[in-house]
């Protein structure tokens, strides 16, 4: 099983590449790698990024977004990694701007996926907050690849386009016994300041 850290976004709202912002003395991407490594669940951690940032990452293989699908958001990153590593039975996808992710949350989601993958033939298992799925903290089956490819060929690069056309299910973030906001995206500098307090 492989983990994909999505780190190719433009970070326009944040004002600088979020992957290299720091929390507790570690860059966001390093923080996520530390959590993923600690779990001994993943045989490889892959960073999906763009050509400009690719050489800046250390500690994991970097796959640059497929040239024909550059600048098409998270789907482009997932597609580019899946296309190269199609033999993996499952991919855990995490956005780099979610540096508070915990091993407990990932383990709970994995158990949910395993319990439902055969009976319900799940392709995507992820978290949701209320009625809002969080497709950038989710497990993806390689079965999603053709659907992602079709989405990238269309004019709709939204994650919703994919999870509405696959067998997907979501567990609420509140089901994880953790009082931190481990699932929160850091979109603005003030978001980072608020979690440092």
From Swiss-Prot:
Family: Belongs to the MobA family.
Keyword set includes GTP-binding: yes
Function: Transfers a GMP moiety from GTP to Mo-molybdopterin (Mo-MPT) cofactor (Moco or molybdenum cofactor) to form Mo-molybdopterin guanine dinucleotide (Mo-MGD) cofactor.
UniProt keyword annotation of Iron-sulfur present: no
Gene Ontology molecular functions: GTP binding; metal ion binding; molybdenum cofactor guanylyltransferase activity
EC number: 2.7.7.77
Binding-site list for Mg(2+): 97
GO biological process: Mo-molybdopterin cofactor biosynthetic process
Protein name: Probable molybdenum cofactor guanylyltransferase
Family annotation (CDD domains): MobA
Subcellular location: Cytoplasm
SUPFAM superfamilies associated with the record: Nucleotide-diphospho-sugar transferases
Keywords from the named record: Cytoplasm, GTP-binding, Magnesium, Metal-binding, Molybdenum cofactor biosynthesis, Nucleotide-binding, Transferase
């Amino acid at each position: 099983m492989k983990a994909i850290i999505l780190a190719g976004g433009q970070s326009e709202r944040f004002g600088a590449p979020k992957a290299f912002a720091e929390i507790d003395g570690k860059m966001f991407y390093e923080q996520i790698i530390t959590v993923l490594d600690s779990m001994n669940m993943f045989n490889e951690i892959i960073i999906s990024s763009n050509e400009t940032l690719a050489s800046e990452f250390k500690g994991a293989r970097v796959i640059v977004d497929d040239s024909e699908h550059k600048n098409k958001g998270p789907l482009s990153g997932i597609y580019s990694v899946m296309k190269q590593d199609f033999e993996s039975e499952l991919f855990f996808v995490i956005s780099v701007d979610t540096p508070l992710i915990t091993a407990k949350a990932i383990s709970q989601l994995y158990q949910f996926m395993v319990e439902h993958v055969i009976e319900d033939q799940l392709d995507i298992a992820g978290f949701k907050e209320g009625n809002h799925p969080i497709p950038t903290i989710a497990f993806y089956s390689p079965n999603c690849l053709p659907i992602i490819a079709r989405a990238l060929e269309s004019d709709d690069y939204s994650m919703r386009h994919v999870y509405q056309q696959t067998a997907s299910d979501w567990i609420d973030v509140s089901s994880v016994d953790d009082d931190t906001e481990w699932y929160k995206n850091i979109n603005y500098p003030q978001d980072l300041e608020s979690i440092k307090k």
